[in-house]
């Protein structure tokens, strides 16, 4: 598999930004709804969404939360800003930022939401270290992502691997290696999306 670089991610999403909602909106919406429902149940005073993209989740977050969304793609953020402008009752700030090196002080947020990001970042371990740093101790981290391992994924990974390499997407992404190896507290794991191909992982930051 070709290594993912920041330039690769930026170039990919410059191309996909106008098409993203049509290609990935409905297909991944069940997972997004599960994630935003979890956030509404938590009602955090402050929320950071890492990889806010085109802002598909913004309207589903509680209006009582201070919401910050970051993305490395300015083209995706342009669409997110248009969405945010139609939510006058929400406190939303959006910024272009590399999530592997964030500008926020330690413990800045009660809750971190990270939908469909972990498998497209150049360095997942560095990203995890950063989200743990900016989430307060005892806060909640929500990771929504596909993970490999099922028989269906075994076939799908091989079918899409060549394309995935070209667009900077890890099709072979192991749950044990990417989630279980850390010394955080996993509160729940829920299968979401068609065939349960993705998981919503709720984590207590320790």
Regions found by a protein language model. Give the residues of each.
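Conserved class I S-adenosyl-L-methionine
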Residues: 1-43, 56, 155-162, 193-196
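C-terminal alpha-helical "lid/dimerization" subdomain adjacent to the S-adenosyl-L-methionine
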Residues: 7, 24-26, 142-198
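Class I SAM-dependent methyltransferase SAM/SAH-binding core
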Residues: 48-101
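A short hydrophobic/small-residue beta-strand
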Residues: 67, 141-142
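A short acidic, Gly/Pro-enriched loop at the edge of an enzyme's catalytic core
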Residues: 100-111
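A short SAM/SAH-binding and catalytic strip from SAM-dependent methyltransferases
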Residues: 111-123
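A short glycine-rich, Lys/Arg-flanked "PGG" loop and its adjoining helix->strand segment in the class I
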Residues: 125-137
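C-terminal lobe and adjacent flexible extensions of AdoMet/dcAdoMet transferase-like proteins
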Residues: 201-206
């Amino acid at each position: 598999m070709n290594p993912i670089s920041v330039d690769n991610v930026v170039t990919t999403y410059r191309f996909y930004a106008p098409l993203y909602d049509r290609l990935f909106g409905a297909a991944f919406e069940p997972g997004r709804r599960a994630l935003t429902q979890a956030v509404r149940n938590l009602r955090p005073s402050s929320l950071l969404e890492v990889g806010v993209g085109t802002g598909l989740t913004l309207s589903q977050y509680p209006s009582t939360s201070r919401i910050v969304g970051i993305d490395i793609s300015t083209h995706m953020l342009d669409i997110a800003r248009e969405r945010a402008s139609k939510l006058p009752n929400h406190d939303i700030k959006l910024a272009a930022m590399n999530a592997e090196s964030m500008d926020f002080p330690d413990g800045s947020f009660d809750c971190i939401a990270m939908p469909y990001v972990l498998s497209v970042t150049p360095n997942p371990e560095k990203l995890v270290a950063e989200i743990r740093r900016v989430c307060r101790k005892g806060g909640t981290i929500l990771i929504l992502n596909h993970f490999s391992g099922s028989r269906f994924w075994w076939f799908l990974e091989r079918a899409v691997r060549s394309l995935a390499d070209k667009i900077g997407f890890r099709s072979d992404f192991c749950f044990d290696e990417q989630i279980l190896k850390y010394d955080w507290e996993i509160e729940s794991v829920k299968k979401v999306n068609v065939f349960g191909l993705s998981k919503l992982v709720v984590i207590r930051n320790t």
